[in-house]
Amino acid sequence: MSIYPNVLLDLYPYCNAHCAFCSYHGKIRHVKPMSEEIYHKVIDEIGNSGECIEIMPYYYGEPLLNPKLFEVCDYISDRAPNVKISISTNGSLLNEENIEKLLKIKTFYFFNFSAYAGTKSTYEKLMGLNYDTLDKIEMAVRRFQSERPDVRLCVGATRDPRFVTEEDSVELVRRFGNIVSFHTISFNSQHGNLNIRTTPQTNPCDVIFASAVVYSDGRVGMCCFDVNGDLIVGDVTKTSLFEALNSDLAQKYRRAHINGLKDVIPICRSCTQPV
């Protein structure tokens, strides 16, 4: 078993989309680009451990906005060769230049395209992007299928009737085939108290065990849905990532989930993430 969960690096927390279901634009946390010192420290630590985990060089932002994205990916591939790089994009910035650079990422493992709706009216309302973004995604998918068959591809979608119609789902499958992956959209109190869970729940959530977030200022969180950083358990500017993830507070949060008491944690109490 790995001593590290999968890690999201909050390298460049800015986004050009306006997804109707996302809490990004309602966040109250101060954001800034992550310093080279912080991400080098985290990547070096994981690389020195020899662990085979996933690193996602983004968090609640569009990774292709980051002018240092490919520099960071090269650093991960060189300093932590056992690590698998996963990237999720809204696709709006996919062009020939960026696709060529993405194709050259050595330890690229998983590439997700957030599409969600297949018709023009729904897509532009839901994502806040131009409909021709789906053409850019299709171009990238074809290139990767041809030139990097080792990279797992996924087109993210939902069948949630609050956001899309059946026609949207059918059109996405028509365009992208079996790489379309439908999932439930999760909400918590950071989404403005809309669509949150109000009934008690005791089943533990796997997210708190399987993922960690290093925020742009170096603080460490335990949940990939925690856009505001409410579940902070340490700070890599003061300790190692391993120490942060095994702090007393981190263990307290995990025990609460294991013991059926996750609802004592405010953000978990409202969360609809399936368990």
Please tell me what each predicted stretch does:
Residues 1-111, 125-135:
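Conserved alpha-helical substructure of the radical SAM core
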Residues 6-10, 50-58, 79-86, 107-119, ...:
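Conserved C-terminal portion of the radical SAM core fold
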Residues 15, 19-22, 205, 223-224, ...:
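Short cysteine clusters
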Residues 21, 25-28, 211, 229-230, ...:
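Secreted/processed peptides and extracellular or luminal domains of membrane proteins
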Residues 25, 114-116, 223, 236:
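Generic beta-structure capping elements
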Residues 26-29, 118-121, 251:
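A short, flexible beta-alpha/helix-coil linker loop
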Residues 34, 94, 123, 205, ...:
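Short clusters of hydrophobic/aromatic residues that line enzyme substrate/ligand-binding pockets
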Residues 139-154, 174-200, 219-220, 224-275:
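C-terminal accessory region of radical SAM enzymes
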